[in-house]
Design a protein with these regions (language model features):
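Short alpha-helical elements
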Residues: 2-345
Length: 345
C-alpha cells in the first residue's frame, strides 16, 4: 500500500520549491546588477581620466605659453573676452587627440558628464571654429616645447607622408580648396605604397631624439625636394639626413653654400661614383619613419573628417602638438621620449 502524503506536507513542499526558485532568481538578478554597476564605474573612471588629462595638459600649456596669452589665457584681440579661454581650447584639442578621440561628436558627448567641472564649456560649433583660430597658438606652444627638449640639435631627419583626402574617383566632388586653389589638394604618387592618391603631402623634419621641429603641408603633386627651400631658411650649420627622394647634386650644393647644410642621402644602385651608405645615418633615418607610424597608429593622422582645408590643417597641427606634449611629459619625467603611449600613466 502506498502511503498517503498529508495535504499540509504538499503545501510545504510547494512553498519550499517556490522559495528555491525565487532564491535562484534573486541571485541571478544580483549578479546582473553588480555587472551593471561595475560597467558604470568603469565608464566613469575612463571619463575621469579624460578630464584629468585635460587639466594636466592645460597646466603645461599655461607654463609654456608665457607672453603668448594674457592673464585670462586668451590671445589679445578686440571684442568680447571669451569665458572658455584660448588655452583651454588648445588643451582640450590636445587631450582629445592624446586619448584617441578624433571625432568632435564623440568628444562632446563624453564631455556632457563634466558640466560641473567645466562650467564654461563651449558648444561643438564654437569649438570647431575656435580650434581653427587657435591653431597658430597651438603650434607656437609646440615650438616652445621642442626648443626645451631638443634645442641644440645638429643632426636632423627629413621625410614626407601622404595624407589622403578621398579616393581619386571622388576627387571632382571634393569641396576642399574650391574657394582658394592654392590650398586645394592634388594627385600624387606614393612610392613606398606604389599607389596614386588624392590629397596632401606632410613634410616633416625631426631630430635624432624623435622630436618634430618643423612640418608643412603641400599638394600631393609637389616633389619632396622642393621642401628643402624652406629648410635652408629655418636651419643652418647642420646635417640633414633624407632618403633617395632628395637626391640632387644641385640642391646639395645650394644648401651647403647658402646655409652650410650638409644633405646626406643614400646613393642609387646604378648611380655613378656609388658609395655605401653610412650605417649610422641609415639607422638614424628610421627615427622619422617611427614617428610617422606613431602618428598613424595612436593619433590616426591618415583618417580625415575635415570638410575644408583650414579644418584639415588644424587637425594636423593638433595631432602633432599632442604627440609633442606627450614627449614633453616623458622628458620632464626622465623617461624615454619615444614611449608616448605610456606618458599619461
Amino acid at each position: 500500500m502506498h502511503s498517503i502524503i498529508p495535504i499540509y506536507q504538499v503545501y510545504l513542499l510547494a512553498e519550499l520549491n517556490y522559495k528555491r526558485f525565487m532564491y535562484k532568481k534573486l541571485c541571478i538578478l544580483l549578479i546582473f546588477s553588480k555587472l551593471k554597476v561595475a560597467k558604470l564605474l568603469i565608464d566613469k573612471y575612463r571619463m575621469h581620466n579624460l578630464y584629468a588629462i585635460f587639466a594636466k595638459l592645460l597646466n603645461i600649456c599655461k607654463q609654456i605659453a608665457g607672453n603668448l596669452v594674457n592673464e585670462s589665457g586668451n590671445v589679445p584681440r578686440r571684442g568680447v573676452v571669451p569665458k572658455f579661454s584660448d588655452l583651454e581650447v588648445v588643451a582640450l584639442n590636445m587631450a582629445s587627440e592624446a586619448v584617441g578621440i578624433d571625432s568632435e561628436s564623440l568628444l562632446f558627448a563624453n564631455l556632457q558628464e563634466y558640466r560641473v567641472e567645466i562650467p564654461n564649456l563651449i558648444s561643438r560649433r564654437q569649438y570647431n571654429d575656435r580650434r581653427k583660430i587657435t591653431s597658430s597658438l597651438c603650434n607656437a606652444i609646440r615650438e616652445r616645447m621642442v626648443a626645451k627638449m631638443d634645442g641644440g640639435e645638429d643632426y636632423f631627419c627629413i621625410d614626407s607622408k601622404p595624407i589622403e583626402v578621398c579616393r581619386i574617383a571622388r576627387s571632382k566632388r571634393c569641396s576642399m580648396g574650391k574657394k582658394d586653389f592654392s590650398k586645394a589638394p592634388g594627385v600624387g604618387y606614393c612610392a613606398s605604397q606604389s599607389m596614386y592618391y588624392y590629397g596632401y603631402k606632410l613634410h616633416a623634419v625631426c631630430g635624432l631624439s624623435g622630436v618634430i621641429h618643423s612640418f608643412d603641408l603641400t599638394k600631393a603633386s609637389v616633389h619632396d625636394i622642393h621642401y628643402l627651400k624652406d629648410v635652408k631658411v629655418d636651419y643652418s650649420n647642420c646635417t640633414v639626413i633624407g632618403d633617395r627622394g632628395y637626391i640632387s647634386a644641385q640642391v646639395q650644393l645650394d644648401l651647403f653654400e647658402t646655409a652650410n647644410i650638409r644633405l646626406e642621402v643614400p646613393y642609387r644602385c646604378n648611380q655613378k661614383e656609388w658609395k655605401p651608405t653610412f650605417p649610422a645615418f641609415a639607422k638614424a633615418r628610421k627615427r622619422i619613419e617611427t614617428l610617422f607610424s606613431q602618428l598613424c597608429d595612436q593619433f590616426m593622422i591618415i583618417r580625415n573628417y575635415a570638410k575644408d582645408t583650414d579644418g584639415l590643417f588644424a587637425r594636423i597641427i593638433g595631432k602633432i602638438s599632442a604627440l609633442t606634449i606627450l614627449q614633453y611629459i616623458n622628458y620632464k619625467n626622465e623617461k624615454p621620449i619615444g614611449r608616448v603611449k605610456y606618458a599619461l600613466f
